[in-house]
Each structure stands twice: as C-alpha cells, then as structure tokens.
Swiss-Prot record:
<comment type="similarity">
    <text>Belongs to the peptidase S14 family.</text>
</comment>
<dbReference type="GO" id="GO:0009368">
    <property type="term" value="C:endopeptidase Clp complex"/>
</dbReference>
<comment type="subunit">
    <text>Fourteen ClpP subunits assemble into 2 heptameric rings which stack back to back to give a disk-like structure with a central cavity, resembling the structure of eukaryotic proteasomes.</text>
</comment>
<dbReference type="Pfam" id="PF00574">
    <property type="entry name" value="CLP_protease"/>
</dbReference>
<comment type="function">
    <text>Cleaves peptides in various proteins in a process that requires ATP hydrolysis. Has a chymotrypsin-like activity. Plays a major role in the degradation of misfolded proteins.</text>
</comment>
<dbReference type="InterPro" id="IPR029045">
    <property type="entry name" value="ClpP/crotonase-like_dom_sf"/>
</dbReference>
<dbReference type="InterPro" id="IPR018215">
    <property type="entry name" value="ClpP_Ser_AS"/>
</dbReference>
<protein>
    <recommendedName>
        <fullName>ATP-dependent Clp protease proteolytic subunit 2</fullName>
        <ecNumber>3.4.21.92</ecNumber>
    </recommendedName>
</protein>
<keyword id="KW-0720">Serine protease</keyword>
<feature type="active site" description="Nucleophile">
    <location>
        <position position="100"/>
    </location>
</feature>
<dbReference type="InterPro" id="IPR001907">
    <property type="entry name" value="ClpP"/>
</dbReference>
<dbReference type="InterPro" id="IPR033135">
    <property type="entry name" value="ClpP_His_AS"/>
</dbReference>
<keyword id="KW-0645">Protease</keyword>
<keyword id="KW-0963">Cytoplasm</keyword>
<dbReference type="GO" id="GO:0004176">
    <property type="term" value="F:ATP-dependent peptidase activity"/>
</dbReference>
<dbReference type="GO" id="GO:0006515">
    <property type="term" value="P:protein quality control for misfolded or incompletely synthesized proteins"/>
</dbReference>
<keyword id="KW-0378">Hydrolase</keyword>
Length: 206
C-alpha cells in the first residue's frame, strides 16, 4: 500500500497558531474514522479512541465514520465489544463502503443513530479463512471458522431484527446492498443527504 501522508490543519487560538494532524483534529469533535482494512493495529487505535472519548464525556455521542472493506474478525469484534462497552452512544456513518466486518460495525451503532451516505455500499457474508497443516489442525480451524460464522450471524440478527434463517441464507455468499436496501434490511436507520449530524463546524445543517 502506498504511503499516504497525514494532512495537518492549523487553528488560531488565544495563544497563537496550533497545528493538528487531521485524525487528532477530528477526535476533538468526537469523530473517529475507520478508513482502512481492519487488523489488530487498527483495532487497537479505534478502541483507544473510544475509551478516551468516554473518559472525556461519558454522556456525549461518539461518531464513528466507516469506509472499510472489512478484515480480521477478532480485531473487528474487539471494536464491536468496545462500542457496546462504553457508556457513550456510538453513532455509525458509512461513507463509501462497509463490507464484511465493516458492515457488522456499522449495524452495531446506537439504535436510531446508524447512517449511510446515499452512494454507500454495504456487504455482508460469512467469514473467510485458509488453513494448512495436519488434518487435526485443519479440523480445529474449521470448527473455529464455523463458530465465528454463527457469532457474526447472531450479531446481525440482534441488531437488524432479521430472522436467523434469512441471515444465514444471505451471508452464505457476498450479499451487496445500497443505502436504501441496507435501511430496509435494518443495518442502518437513515440515509444522510444532506448532512445533518456531526461535523467540524460550529453549526450543523438542517
């Protein structure tokens, strides 16, 4: 993956100019950005940001923007569990795509506060995995993948209200949805256009 420099923004304060990297500046406004594939390093950063924002104000919403193709199930579940653990309501907003584990995090937002932009793409499916080694090791890993599959399906059922039968059928292969379909499915609550939640400005659009 090519290196992408992190932009900086400069603000005027009563003490003069102050520069922030864009991630830190967004964090000041309780915005967390998940914009990559999910692995342990990414999950640790997201978890740390959620815990920090809870310590800052346990009653104020956190806004998690998601543009992710998915990734590690265990890393994603670390983020999921932290979202459920913190006292702050976590609003989720899909920009671009929320696929695989990214879709699970999208639907795990606070009820009534799960959003997608109009051109977003959402995809759910069963976990992927490749195994090599002795037959016993392969059997162990296969059982674990099936356990993860059942776990993720349970979470989708819990947060969407769909039946387990439908979720098992839909996740058997890649199941793509646009924003309207994701709303009908129960993955999101609202399609955002124009923006009327969260932002850096002093006033929000109505």
């Amino acid at each position: 993956m090519p290196f992408m420099p992190v932009p900086y923004v400069i603000e005027q304060t009563h003490r003069g100019e102050r520069s922030y990297d864009i991630i830190s500046r967004l964090l000041k406004d309780r915005i967390v950005m998940l914009g990559t594939e999910i692995d342990d390093d990414v999950a640790n950063v997201i978890v740390a940001q959620l815990l920090f924002l809870e310590s800052e104000d346990p009653d104020k919403d956190i806004n998690l923007y998601i543009n992710s193709p998915g990734g590690s199930v265990t890393a994603g579940l670390a983020i999921y569990d932290t979202m459920q653990y913190v006292k702050c309501p976590v609003s989720t907003i899909c920009v671009g795509q929320a696929a695989s584990m990214g879709a699970v995090l999208l639907l795990a937002g606070a009820k009534g506060k799960r959003y997608a932009l109009p051109s977003s793409r959402i995809m759910i499916h069963q976990p992927l995995g490749g195994v090599r080694g002795q037959a016993t090791d392969i059997e162990i890993q296969a059982k674990e993948i099936l356990r993860m599959k059942a776990k993720l399906n349970e979470l989708i059922v819990k947060h969407t209200g769909q039946s387990i039968e439908r979720v098992e059928k839909d996740t058997d292969r890649d199941y793509f949805m646009g924003a309207s379909e994701a709303k009908a499915y129960g993955i999101i609550d609202e399609i955002q256009n124009p923006r009327k939640v969260v932002g850096l400005g002093k006033e929000e659009k109505k």
